Amino acid sequence: SDIDNFTNAIGYFKASNTEANDSFGYSVSLSGDGMTMAVGAIHEDSSATGISGNQSDNNSSDSGAVYVFSMTDAGWVQQSYIKASNTTTNHRFGTSVSLSDDGNTLAVGTLVSTKAYVFSRTGSTWSEQAIIESNIAPFQGFGIRVSISSNGNTLAVGSPLDSGTGAAYIFVRSGSNWSQQAYIKASNADAQDSFGTALHLSSDGNTLAVGAFQEDSSASGINGDQVNNSKGSSGAAYVSTRNSNTWSQQAYIKASNTGLLATFGRSISLSANGDTLVVGSDREGSTALGIDGGQTTSGSNFSGATYVYSRTGSTWSQQAYIKADRAVQGFGISIDLSDDANTLIVGTEAVLSGLNYSGVSGSGGFNGSAVRAGIAFVFTRNNSSWIQESFVNASNAEEGDYFGGSVALSADGNTLAVGARLEDSAATGV
């Protein structure tokens, strides 16, 4: 990964219809080549429907919208303004977004409805291809997370309140028609585990990782005891694989230092081949700094951690335990891996040490008053060894922006997108 390119390619993106409290940047996704970006704004209020409708009629509160940007010879431009074809108040369209590798297929999740949406692009023109519906009641969280395979033909949708325990749904596309292929539950499904809050597909769609950040088992490591629920909301991750259209669970993964309320599985990311898995635990409590430090959970104000696992054949093992190099809070609230798994971006809610800067690796100078502006850390891997290479903050970092609440990397790891859903500027466009 050429980190210097981050400095050279910094762009500042706003909605074309910026309004207070729209939460533009709540979700973000990049195409494989980094030339197409989708951004969700879950509290956008327009009553428009479909593609590039009227952006100024704010009569559908919190209906949500998605904005697609593309890189052209003249730089980044907004290509499309996308709403659901059945725009409804409070649906929070754009809660999650996922682009195929070529950027021509976009999946969009909602928070409140029982629907996810698929859009396709021909040239520069977008159209709604399908509404993906579940057979469950509303308010089960269906669509809180979506992940689409590289070719756009396999879609995973999380539903963390499904039957009270959570589920993941797999849909497949043939031509332009979508159908459900699988319904996936945790091997130890329990009430309020929130299985499906985070999920990610490998490039070929044959490996699925799912987070259950409120799972309660006291186990640690790989395939441990799933029954002893004495560590409330410690969290877990599950890996399932597809063989001839049949899905089965391959691994049950816990943190190596399972802790009460650690929320392991809050975020999750897979490499393209599915052999590297990163799991975020944004409320993990050790005081360690850096790579593979001490893992004793001593209640350090929910500093957070990320864990890297590698697969050989069908066997998983932990490769690294990663913390920020400074005192932070909420490290691991968002994560993304490059295709080769050699670049990792980790979003963080707050920097508590007073060492908060703007720009790339502090190039914009010190900003001690913006402790909760948010920050994103860049890590790189050489063979199996990880280092922190850089950190990235907004060029206009301000308190409470939540920069880093969403992150996305291009396939090669050289283009990075970071959302700041509570940034306050009234600017519009790029």
Identify the meaning behind each predicted range:
Residues 1-430:
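Conserved beta-strand/short-helix segments
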